Amino acid sequence: AHRGDWRNFPENSLEGIENAIKMGVDIVELDVQRTQDGVLILMHDETLNRTTTGKGKVSEVTMDYISNLYLRNGCAIRTKHKVPTLEEALLLTKGRIMINLDKADRYFDEVYALLKKTGTVNQVIMKGGKSVEQVKGQYEKYLCEIIYMPIVSLDKLNAEQQIEQFCKDINPVAFELLFIKGNNELPKKIPAMLKGKSLIW
């Protein structure tokens, strides 16, 4: 469920997550931003303008300011729903649904601390577009506990080699694969290459 059940509730809202769970969804995708005072919240955009009644960059306002705002729905209409913190979302989903965290790897240490605090380490998928070397250098101490999903652009020249290297060094449960070029042959080739090794998102 992309940003929760965004068709019936505001994106990245607790109510949208709850409804996705009730619908029987296996994985809910959520986005993370950090406030000026270091609170991790659910928000796709870097600014509050599109999805809330507030204005400005998330990174330049406090959680106190955000707590007084209301979320807007897909038609930009104000709702009664509030902006949730990541911790609130983790507590809501604990033991109930897998979470695919987007835009969160830049806050890996802080996210991990919240996962440990809430007991949700085993139900969260962290992902990012970093190289194998960067992932090993920055996150290796977490990889034995956290599900990490590499994001690989198949339009890049070394995409196939990058996937092979990830399989060899990290053995990820899944890959998120992106491509735009219509003449790219890799989308046809990769499923066979990853069969029995990693899933494709």
Question: For each of these PLM feature ranges, what is it?
Answer:
Residues 1-201:
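Phosphate-group recognition and catalysis centered on beta-loop-alpha active-site segments
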